[in-house]
Amino acid sequence: MVALVNNMRKITIPSVGGKLVSSGQFQNFIASCILFCCPGIYLAVTGLGAGGGHPDAYHMADVTNSLLYALFTVCGWAGGPILKYLGPRWALALGATGYPIYIGGLWYFDNTGKQGFTIFTGAYEGIAAGLLWASTAYISLSYSCANQKSQFIATQWTILAFGSTVGSFIAFGINYHSTSTGVPMAVYIIFIIIMACAVLLAILFIKSPSDVRKSDGTSALSPSNKTFGQELWGLFEAAKDWRLLCLLPASFASQSTIAWQSHLNSYYFSLRTRSLNNVLFWVIQFFVPYLFTLILDAKALKRRTRGIIGLTIQAVVIMATLSGELGWIVSKHIDLHDTSPDLDWTQRGYGGALVLYLLMGIQYGSSIVSVQWCISLLSSDPDKYARYAGLYKGTQAAGMCVSFGIDAAGVSFLGQGIIYFIFLFVMCASQLIMTSIFGKETDRLSTKEHFTDDKSYIDGVMPSTDTYMNEKTSDELDKKSLPSDQVYV
């Protein structure tokens, strides 16, 4: 792996140039398109249930996904140092290769019923996904100005959701008249082709951070060119930040409902109905991130005020949704050990089930934005963003790993719902507490803190410090309450 990383750094394939391409917003758009092609399409497959295969294969999917997200966790945590060593361009290109390979593994399983190769491809995707997600999170945080954080995050998630919607429409169109429980070969082929395009996007359009300019004209500082060992030590130091540790439970919980919802969709509905559910689940997420952004980035309100308002609304919706879904499971006596009702959209009872499924889509999309927005309160240092991004995505993957592990263990739908009620309550509470404490603060590290032991930089360019000094915050900070060895504005 070390040799591969070193060789990739030496590759000098030219990328597309131009002022537009080098803007932070365009770079975030390209990162979003990569999410469209890879995780977006992958989540469409996951939403079909059982990893896109036959519903009786859900145990194989749970085992594979547990391994995938376990490796995703480890590689996500290490993603920051690897990202800073490779640079975003090659980190994204390498990370994108895991998704088409994994879909190929699912295709192989659907045709042969043999699990070995599928489990291997799941393991490879876990490694690749940790790198891809750390890179996209870094871009959303480092290439945006102080008042654009949630906008950049929302752009990534909305375009990813569009990818999942396109994938779901493809599957829905093919499955509309299908009576089979499996996924047709055409779905796999189309998905693999779309995912492979992400590798080309990364190679052709992603620029070095030293070449990227934010919308206010300042430089998106290039991560420092420390040794890999120094970067790992920096990761360890970041992991000791108690503020970040307080938000990691929120990261853990934010997407942990994925296996529960996927299995419910696979178990309770017919193939064409769960394909329709999948379409609508992602369509609603076109709107959720940007509606949430209108609150979190509202210039008329102070940052802490708008954060508390937005996160309180989110908490009420999430808790009400989970309460409703638990009530639905109890009232319908839904038990995974019973025969599937195979509910079709033409049958009575579908409307209420669909509403609950869509509300869980609101939880899913809003949680992505809210956790990253809370993490953006902690710092404006690109070095820290790279490390925070890896720790955040790795911990989020750990929650998804546990989610698939719980499902694979045969825990009842009701039992899983209670677990996720607790998880998401902790998420909402920790976000509100951290926003109330740190909502007014933005870490503007001094030149001394960021550059003391850094003598060389990516592309040999000494980053400008004007990014730290020129970003404006919406709030005034009571400097008397802050430690004297740090600079805040």
From Swiss-Prot:
Keyword S-adenosyl-L-methionine: no
Subcellular location as annotated: Membrane
Keyword Transmembrane helix: yes
Keyword terms, alphabetized: Membrane, Transmembrane, Transmembrane helix
Protein name: Uncharacterized membrane protein C6F6.04c
Membrane protein topology class: Multi-pass membrane protein
Highest taxon in the source lineage: Eukaryota
Biological-process GO terms, alphabetical: transmembrane transport
Major localization class: membrane
Pfam families per the UniProt record, alphabetical: UNC-93
Cellular component GO terms, alphabetical: membrane
Record-annotated membrane-spanning stretches: 29-49, 67-87, 90-110, 119-139, 152-172, 186-206, 276-296, 308-328, 351-371, 397-417, 418-438
SUPFAM superfamilies in the cross-refs: MFS general substrate transporter (SSF103473)
GO molecular function, one term: transmembrane transporter activity
